[in-house]
């Protein structure tokens, strides 16, 4: 399948979806998009800018949710035009899907909503590439049913994304077998490296996170031969308005991506061992 002007899957080099969790301001979006676009261009990595206009599943009613659909789409359109990069954003059950589809290159469905049949169908009917996040409660082999729903709309541009599985209260773990298992769906497989280290509700009224584990999990996912890496980043994670504890420090990302590119090339150049 294609995102904008590049191919994903089928052994192609990994692509990156990255940006701040939520659109905090137009200036923040432009600054982060510009920096990430420059870094990925220098490294030769295909890039999709990610940021959300609304975070509908925040832990607390008092948590910052975003700038709303109208302002958010206006900013994403400006990012896309200014830096000539594709963009991805989250959609929710009450999102005006057609309006979003006019702007973004990829629509992303939240993990909590992966079993909501009407929601999945309505999103996929827009005809855009869709990144479906696997629920924290779902076995990887059960994603075949979610994919079947999605593709029943005639949309074959479906990706599946691993973002960790619930492990007791306020904790997630990443089962790397999940990435290999989900390849059986026939869809490109994406690993969400930053939400996988989230501690849901771990700070009482907000989620915590262990960003120190993002590098090791990302490298492990590369060893499986993933098609895409999802990694939220922020210039000052401690000051982020959403998901700061698990966001990757933006100004450290170039060196890390360079390493991941080497790993990706090494793994995908090796023959698969059949057992």
From Swiss-Prot:
Question: What Gene3D superfamilies does the annotation carry?
Answer: Aldolase class I
Q: Provide the reaction this enzyme catalyses.
A: D-arabinose 5-phosphate + phosphoenolpyruvate + H2O = 3-deoxy-alpha-D-manno-2-octulosonate-8-phosphate + phosphate
Keywords, alphabetical: Cytoplasm, Lipopolysaccharide biosynthesis, Transferase
EC no. given is 2.5.1.55
Subcellular location, in the record's words? Answer: Cytoplasm
Metabolic or biological pathway, per its Swiss-Prot or TrEMBL entry: Carbohydrate biosynthesis; 3-deoxy-D-manno-octulosonate biosynthesis; 3-deoxy-D-manno-octulosonate from D-ribulose 5-phosphate: step 2/3; Bacterial outer membrane biogenesis; lipopolysaccharide biosynthesis
Provide the primary localization: cytoplasm
Biological process GO annotation list? keto-3-deoxy-D-manno-octulosonic acid biosynthetic process
Q: Which InterPro entries match?
A: Aldolase_TIM, DAHP1/KDSA, KDO8P_synthase
The broad enzyme category this protein falls into is transferase
State any GO CC term. Answer: cytoplasm
**GO molecular-function term, one example from the UniProt record:** 3-deoxy-8-phosphooctulonate synthase activity
Among PANTHER family, the record links this protein to: PHOSPHO-2-DEHYDRO-3-DEOXYHEPTONATE ALDOLASE
Similarity remark: Belongs to the KdsA family.
**NCBIfam families per the record?**
KDO8P_synth, PRK05198.1
| Family annotation (HAMAP family) | KDO8P_synth (MF_00056)
Protein name (record): 2-dehydro-3-deoxyphosphooctonate aldolase
| Source organism (scientific name) | Francisella philomiragia subsp. philomiragia (strain ATCC 25017 / CCUG 19701 / FSC 153 / O#319-036)
Its taxonomic path starts at: Bacteria, Pseudomonadati, Pseudomonadota, Gammaproteobacteria, Thiotrichales
């Amino acid at each position: 399948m294609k995102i904008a002007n590049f191919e994903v899957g089928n052994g192609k080099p990994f692509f990156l979806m990255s940006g701040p969790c939520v659109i905090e301001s137009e200036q923040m979006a432009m600054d982060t998009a510009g920096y990430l676009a420059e870094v990925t261009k220098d490294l030769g990595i295909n890039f999709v800018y990610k940021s959300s206009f609304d975070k509908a599943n925040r832990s607390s009613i008092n948590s910052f949710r975003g700038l709303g659909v109208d302002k958010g789409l206006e900013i994403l359109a400006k990012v896309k035009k200014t830096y000539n990069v594709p963009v991805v954003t989250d959609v929710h059950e009450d999102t005006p899907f057609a309006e979003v589809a006019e702007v973004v290159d990829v629509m992303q469905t939240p993990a909590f909503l992966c079993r909501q049949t009407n929601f999945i169908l309505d999103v996929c009917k827009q005809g855009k590439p869709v990144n479906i996040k696997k629920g924290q409660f779902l076995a990887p082999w059960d994603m075949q049913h979610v994919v079947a729903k999605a593709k029943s709309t005639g949309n074959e541009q479906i990706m599946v994304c691993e973002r960790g599985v619930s492990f007791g209260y306020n904790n997630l773990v990443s089962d790397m077998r999940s990435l290999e298992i989900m390849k059986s769906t026939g869809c490109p497989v994406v690993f969400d490296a930053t939400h996988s280290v989230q501690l849901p509700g771990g700070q009482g009224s907000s989620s915590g996170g262990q960003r120190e584990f993002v590098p090791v999990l990302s490298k492990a996912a590369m060893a499986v031969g993933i098609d895409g890496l999802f990694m939220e980043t922020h210039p000052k994670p401690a000051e982020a308005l959403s998901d700061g504890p698990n966001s990757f420090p933006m100004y450290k990302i170039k060196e890390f991506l360079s390493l991941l590119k080497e790993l990706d090339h090494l793994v995908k150049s090796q023959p698969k061992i059949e057992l």
